[in-house]
């Protein structure tokens, strides 16, 4: 029976990996799952290639964003190596996805999972829609999550935290994404509950040293002003609106929307209730990861990419308990039914997305390339793909920074009022007041845009606006 059980798990893992590879290959030359947030990463990478960063703007007039330097710099290196922006972003995502899978396998083994349990961990992660979408998105979430999972794996191997490995990986995750604080908070929580606080103190000191060293290594790339911008925006000018109930509500919504995520959640909770894991770093890390994710998801602009670390650690928990679970037969049946079905669903869905007429954005890119005058785009990727530089990084933080009095963000509003832009590319109609009031650009940009520009057409689902021939008199 064991051979049959292990063989079935291996088969499901193969199906999950093949489905993921098929999705990546099908989407490789399209812009599927990339949006304005990916564009923010690309503009930061482009700025770095031109010696610019937040506080050191040049052709890019506004470089404020929530994203820290390491991942954009990785994308910049891939671009400098000769890849297009599309393929640099795709490659960065795939490499980060492979790192996360390797980290999850390593952490599962460190937690005591059997070889079959490790395969279950990988199958649960690879089959999940959240992982597949993130692996196409061109953003830092997978890289940061991979570092955090590696940190948890190191902690499982060094419970007293006498070495530097856990702190180094945890600091790397935090340097990649300022909200990636799973391991530091988990260590501090366990330290507060333990009689001996020395492991937590050792970790905190080493974490600080590695983090400072990481910032120092990036000083030639304006890392101080870059991190200062990311922190100040996160803490004092967060984009969009927030609601405390949104975090847990979003988690429940995703669990209700994706059967494979519900399966991971049930298996992880079952595993964490077992006595063997009650004092494990894996338990505190998973709980903290979920808590952090819900806190971030309270912001209405946050999406399921913030659940990647939680997904990976939950998958590790499920793999650890695979051989000892009292409901292992039920778990096997659920894995055999749910994961292949999820793979089938996502393969066909992404095949449709990739075949859609606007998936390659050829029309909107051509329009941006052909315009001789200055262009402003809600999704900066449109401009980079057209061989241009974008004046902004992020329309969401542009709104919040302008409201906070940032002169760089306010300058974009002034230029819009002066009808400086020969072409403005929006993701939806400018009349969508709720979207542009609460999420992107804000009234400071959109009111003069509506007054001084008119819709001149559509391209690949984007709305094109050009200056009005005659501006109507103010009322």
List PLM regions with ranges.
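Loop-to-helix entry region of an early transmembrane alpha helix in multi-pass inner-membrane enzymes
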Residues: 69-73, 81-102
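Short acidic/glycine- and proline-prone juxtamembrane loop motifs at membrane-interface regions
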Residues: 133-143
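Transmembrane-helix signature of polytopic, membrane-embedded enzymes
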Residues: 104-128, 145-146, 281-284
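Membrane-interface alpha helices of multi-pass inner-membrane proteins
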Residues: 149-154, 162-178, 184-191, 209, ...
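Extracytoplasmic
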Residues: 67, 339-472
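Extracytosolic helix-loop segments that constitute the early lumenal/periplasmic catalytic or substrate-binding loops
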Residues: 39-63, 70-73
């Amino acid at each position: 029976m064991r051979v049959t059980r292990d063989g079935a798990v291996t088969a499901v893992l193969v199906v999950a990996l093949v489905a993921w590879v098929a999705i990546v290959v099908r989407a490789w030359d399209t812009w599927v799952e990339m949006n304005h947030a990916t564009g923010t990463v690309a503009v930061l990478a482009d700025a770095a290639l031109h010696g610019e960063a937040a506080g050191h703007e040049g052709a890019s007039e506004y470089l404020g964003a929530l994203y820290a330097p390491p991942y954009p710099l990785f994308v910049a290196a891939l671009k400098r190596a000769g890849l297009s922006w599309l393929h640099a972003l795709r490659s960065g995502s795939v490499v980060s996805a492979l790192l996360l899978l390797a980290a999850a396998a390593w952490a599962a083994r460190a937690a005591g999972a059997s070889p079959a349990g490790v395969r279950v961990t990988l199958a649960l992660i690879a089959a999940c829609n959240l992982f597949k979408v993130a692996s196409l998105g061109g953003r830092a979430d997978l890289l940061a999550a991979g570092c955090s999972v590696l940190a948890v794996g190191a902690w499982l191997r060094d419970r007293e935290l006498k070495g530097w490995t856990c702190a180094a990986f945890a600091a790397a995750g935090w340097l990649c994404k300022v909200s990636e604080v799973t391991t530091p908070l988990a260590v501090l929580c366990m330290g507060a509950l333990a009689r001996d606080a020395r492991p937590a103190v050792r970790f905190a000191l080493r974490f600080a040293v590695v983090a400072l060293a990481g910032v120092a290594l990036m000083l030639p790339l304006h890392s101080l002003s870059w991190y200062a911008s990311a922190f100040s925006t996160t803490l004092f000018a967060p984009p969009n609106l927030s609601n405390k109930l949104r975090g847990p509500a979003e988690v429940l919504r995703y669990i209700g929307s994706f059967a494979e995520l519900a399966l991971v959640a049930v298996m992880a909770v079952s595993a964490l209730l077992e006595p063997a894991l009650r004092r494990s770093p894996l338990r505190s890390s998973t709980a903290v990861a979920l808590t952090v994710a819900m806190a971030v998801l309270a912001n209405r602009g946050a999406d399921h990419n913030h659940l990647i670390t939680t997904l990976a650690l939950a998958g590790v928990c499920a793999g650890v308990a695979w051989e000892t679970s009292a409901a292992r037969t039920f778990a096997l049946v659920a894995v055999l039914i749910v994961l292949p079905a999820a793979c089938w669903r996502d393969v066909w869905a992404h095949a449709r997305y990739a075949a859609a007429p606007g998936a390659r954005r050829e029309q909107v890119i051509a329009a941006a390339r052909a315009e001789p005058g200055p262009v402003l785009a809600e999704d900066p990727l449109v401009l980079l793909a057209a061989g241009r530089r974008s004046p902004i990084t992020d329309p969401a933080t542009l709104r919040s920074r302008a409201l906070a009095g940032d002169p760089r963000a306010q300058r974009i509003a002034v230029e819009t009022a002066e009808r400086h832009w020969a072409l403005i590319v929006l993701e939806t109609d400018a009349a969508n007041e709720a979207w542009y009031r609460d999420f992107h650009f804000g009234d400071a940009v959109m009111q003069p845009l509506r007054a001084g520009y008119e819709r001149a057409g559509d391209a690949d689902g984007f709305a094109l606006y050009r200056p009005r021939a005659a501006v109507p008199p103010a009322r």
